[in-house]
């Protein structure tokens, strides 16, 4: 079957706990595909300096089953 698609939208100066907790939980669920997106693709830096790399451009995402906004 198709994986359950979870999209995390990550904005600059995000709170790393708001991202890491849900990400770690969803990561452990079988048959889940997690996509990280930001307004302008690439690296996004948290308010504490944590860098999340390789995000997709939000405008290019067509669909998801669950949306998480950080």
PLM feature spans:
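Extended, subdomain-level signal for the structured scaffold at the beginning of enzyme domains
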Residues: 1-70
């Amino acid at each position: 079957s198709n994986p359950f698609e979870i999209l995390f939208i990550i904005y600059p100066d995000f709170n790393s706990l708001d991202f890491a907790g849900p990400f770690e939980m969803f990561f452990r669920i079988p048959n889940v595909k997690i996509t990280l997106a930001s307004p302008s693709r690439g690296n996004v830096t948290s308010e504490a300096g944590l860098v999340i790399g390789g995000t997709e451009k939000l405008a290019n995402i067509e669909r998801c089953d669950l949306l998480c906004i950080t």
